Amino acid sequence: LASEKIKDSDGILPVVESMSEISGITSVLLASEFLSSTSGGKGVMLGGVTGVTPTEVVIIGANTAGEHAARAALGLGAIVRVFDNSVHRLRNFQNLMGQRLYTSTFHPQVLSKALKSTDVLIGALAAEDIRPWFYVTEEMVKGMKPGSVIIDLSVDSGGCVETTECRALKDPLYEKHGVIHFSAWNLPSRVPRTASIALSNVFRPLIQDIADAGGITPMMKFNNGLRNGVYLFNGILTNEPLGQKFGILSKDINLLLAAF
């Protein structure tokens, strides 16, 4: 059972949504620290004060993580620019934020120009939106200002910045082409108490429903959301994309449950 694939009654992935909220907000707080001189940054504050030009933040991905990163950055007074490969998501993003923001689809020249002046780049693309090519190339990173910060939240799914590396949690910070990189896989683990409470809010009612149904198998029969998270059932692979990726035969979970 893959908890991140379980859906609620509204068709939302509650585990992913909760962790994305935490990742988005935490990424901005970390970027603020990395910009400080004590962390080897440029010695600037993320945001702005009266009479001082505010810092600029570029966010790649108009999703939940991107939304909460944008809210945190805007709350600090930063200039925020958002890029995504879907006009529909960008439009929804604008509506959710309740204000006009700089948004753009992925035009290499436009993105490259924005990166030359930005102080922080946050990659928030979901795994299913990452393509074999990188949205932010190494050449674009070379053009960024020295001491700028890159936090790629999708590094464990391939990343959307060519220069990001999936590093150990104990050594996540490194510099490349004069730009500070933070390997941000499993970012919620840096705030474990908050993450644990958020996960408990998701799992407690689910576990109660499973108990009331008499077990997980009876629950799966009438709960489509729980069924969506099943990868293996009685030793049989039920996730077709996973089977295609590794060349393993998979079967429809609905057909298997009919026998129980």
Residue ranges and their predicted role:
Residues 40-126:
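Glycine-rich phosphate/diphosphate-binding loop of Rossmann-like nucleotide-binding domains
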Residues 4-30, 34-45, 155, 160-260:
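Adenosine-phosphate binding glycine-rich loop
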Residues 1-3, 83, 124, 153, ...:
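Generic beta-sheet signal
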Residues 97-177:
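Rossmann-like adenosine-cofactor binding region
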Residues 22-26, 64, 68, 84-88, ...:
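Conserved active-site and cofactor/substrate-binding residues in soluble primary-metabolism enzymes
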